[in-house]
Amino acid sequence: MAVTTSMSFNLMASFRGMSLSSSSSSSFFKGEFGPSSLRLPNKSPLSVSPFPLTIESAHKKGAGSTKNGRDSKGQRLGVKIYGDQVAKPGAIIIRQRGTKFHPGKNVGIGKDHTIFALIDGLVKFEKYGPDKKKVSVYPREIQPENPNSYRARKRENFRLQREKKKARREGYSFQPQLILASAATDNADESAVC
């Protein structure tokens, strides 16, 4: 009951400003529109807009489709073994789409442009032409270690600690001995060169 009264009140409010007198009605039906023939109604706060409030878009899947907003997972492309790192035979060096990197020495290329190592060695990235890059694998050359390097000194220090600990467990007191590398001679003056 209350709904029908409010709707009738809205209709009355929308037609309040229109007047259809005998003089203006004939001109209205003839198609003559003027300021005297048609007066627009005053806007009231209770009036209903002529268009429904719907949001439309040009495409069927624009707003709230369940098929929207999805993305495929990443393809895990890129460099897998970097320069100056060791690669074993068959190890994948680069996964790529197209040939961003071209194969060099001792590497192969798969049908999906994956570059892989053919031999055991170090990976090197090289320039190839003005704007291309080439990947090669070179055999690893093992260089002798410097005895004065930090790694060698540290290894020797840990070896001495293990020997001391082992000697303590056995009850033997370990005393490091100094050994001179020079030959033992009776006359030190004869061998000295000044």
From Swiss-Prot:
Q: What is this protein called?
A: Large ribosomal subunit protein bL27c
Q: Where in the cell is it found?
A: Plastid, Chloroplast
**GO cellular component terms listed in the entry, alphabetical order:** chloroplast; ribonucleoprotein complex; ribosome
Q: What InterPro entries does the record tag this protein with?
A: Ribosomal_bL27, Ribosomal_bL27_CS
Quaternary structure, per UniProt, is: Component of the chloroplast large ribosomal subunit (LSU). Mature 70S chloroplast ribosomes of higher plants consist of a small (30S) and a large (50S) subunit. The 30S small subunit contains 1 molecule of ribosomal RNA (16S rRNA) and 24 different proteins. The 50S large subunit contains 3 rRNA molecules (23S, 5S and 4.5S rRNA) and 33 different proteins.
- Entry's Gene Ontology molecular function annotations: structural constituent of ribosome
SUPFAM superfamilies linked to this entry = Ribosomal L27 protein-like
List the PROSITE patterns hit by this protein, alphabetically: RIBOSOMAL_L27
NCBIfam families membership: L27
Q: Where is this region: Disordered?
A: 57-76
**Biological process per Gene Ontology, one example term:** translation
Provide the family line. Answer: Belongs to the bacterial ribosomal protein bL27 family.
- One Pfam family per UniProt: Ribosomal_L27
